[in-house]
Amino acid sequence: VTYISKSNNIDQQNITQPGTTESQTKLLIYSIQTIGWTTSAKIDPFKGFHLHALFTYQKPKYNNYKVSYVKDGQTFNLDASGNIVKEIPQILVELDPSYNITENLRIWLSFRYFGKTYANLTDALYFNGHWETFAGINWNVNKHLSLNASVVNFLNQKGASGTINGSELTSKKDAAKFNNHLMSGNYLRPFTLELGASIKF
């Protein structure tokens, strides 16, 4: 079990008044605290096969993260202290099996699981957990030439990550207002085939 605390983080946050596009930029100095553990294993059950597995659980929280927004005599307060840090999953899983068909020919798979991540400071909006998958083959043709082929997102998973602009003061009861609205952000890489070669002299 590991405990980590980091103080004097500096953040320049754009705070948007709910229901409007008006925002103010605020400078915050805050702390982050987390506790968690990581378990890693390497398994070679038979010749040529190797499995690496890793599991991480963490719970990063804001501390002393407070800001006020004043507009037309109204004060909007945001206190994210005790909330889970946005964009950071609490659960991470890695599974990496591989098999050497011959001394020079290797096939491999890679699975990455990212748990639920919050998309705003109040933990009112979040993205569901998702898998990211990869696969490939590596062939050392000779001492001068190596070939490889890989597939990104071979399960064709779809999903988003990051934050949602303008949602800093959004409460959990108002989160439904973001349903069925187009928004910009980050997304999982689509199904992709990649080929490569390496030449050594």
Task: Give names to the regions the model predicted.
Residues 2-7, 23-117:
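Gram-negative outer-membrane beta-barrel transporters
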Residues 11-26, 63-82, 161-184:
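Solvent-exposed loop segments that connect transmembrane elements
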Residues 50, 82-201:
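Conserved C-terminal beta-signal and adjacent last beta-strands/turns
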